[in-house]
Swiss-Prot record:
Record InterPro entries: PPIase_dom_sf (IPR046357), PPIase_PpiC (IPR000297), PrsA_foldase (IPR050245)
Protein name: Parvulin-like PPIase
Gene3D superfamilies cross-referenced by the UniProt entry: 3.10.50.40
GO terms, molecular function: peptidyl-prolyl cis-trans isomerase activity
PpiC domain span: 138-231
Record-listed E.C. numbers: 5.2.1.8
Superkingdom classification of source: Bacteria
Catalytic activity: [protein]-peptidylproline (omega=180) = [protein]-peptidylproline (omega=0)
GO CC list: cell outer membrane
Stated family: Belongs to the PpiC/parvulin rotamase family.
Keyword terms of this UniProt record: Cell outer membrane, Isomerase, Membrane, Rotamase, Signal
Organism this protein belongs to: Rickettsia felis (strain ATCC VR-1525 / URRWXCal2) (Rickettsia azadi)
Amino acid sequence: MKKLSVIFLSVSMLSGIAFADKDKVVATYKGGEVKESQIMKEFKPQLNLQSGETIKNFDDFPPQDQEKLIKIYVNNLLLKEEVAKSNITSSKEFQEKLENAKNQLAQQELLANYIKSNITDKMFDDEYNKYVGNLKGKEQIKVAHILVKSQKEANNIKTKLSKGGNFTKLAEESSLDKASASNGGVIGYILLNQPGQLVPEFEKKAFALKVNEVSTPVKTDFGWHIIKVLEKKPVPIPTKEEAKVTIDNILAAEVLKKYISDLEAKADLKIMLPKAGSKAGS
C-alpha cells in the first residue's frame, strides 16, 4: 500500500512538471514575464465568441496573431502600472466617468439578463417557423454594380459595356464603392424587400434583370449605378442552428421593446413637448 502511495505521488509530481513545462514563457519585460496561460485566460473567451470557433491552445494562433496578443497583453500591464503611478483615478472628473460607465454596464447587464429569462423555447420555435415561412419560395440574386457620381459617367460606362467592355475591370477602375470594386463590383446575394440590405431603387432594378443582364443607369442617394445580375437561385432554408443568431436578435428586439414600453407605462411618462407641426404657445 505504501509503494502504491509513493508511485501515485511520483506520477502526480511528474504530471505537474509536464503541465508546467507546457505553460511556456512567451515574453519577458522589466518586472515580469508572460506565459501562454495568461494570454489564453485573458483573450480566449472573447476570441472564441468573435471567431465562432473553439480555440484551445496558444499554438492554435498564427505566429503574427500570437505576437499581437502578447503585445496587447503586455501593453495593458504597462499602462496599468502607469495608471497606478498617477493620481488620475482620484480626480472628480474620472470618478464621474467611472460612475457613468458603471451605470451603463449595470443597465446592459440588466437588459441582457431580462432578455435571456424572457425568451422561451416556444417563442424561438414560433419565430423560426415564421422566419422560414417567409423564405420559402423566395429567390435570391447575386449582384455586382459600378457606382459613379454622375449620369454622364454612368452612360459612358454603359456604352463601354455594350461594346464588349469587361464589367469586372471597369468596376475595379471606376466604381466609387471601393469595398465591392476590389471584388469586381460584386456585392453578394440579396433578397427582395429585406430590411437593411440595399435601397429600394437598386433592388427593384436588380430583381427585374435576367442573369448576366446589365441595367441602364439607376439613380439612388449614393449616386448612379450600373447593375449586373450574376446568378439567381432559390433561398436556402436554414436549420435552427444556422438561424439561431438571427432569431435571437429578432426576439431580443421584441422583448426589449415591450420591456421599455412597460417601464414607461408604469412611470406614467408624459411628453410635454408641442406636437409636430404646431407652434409653441399657440
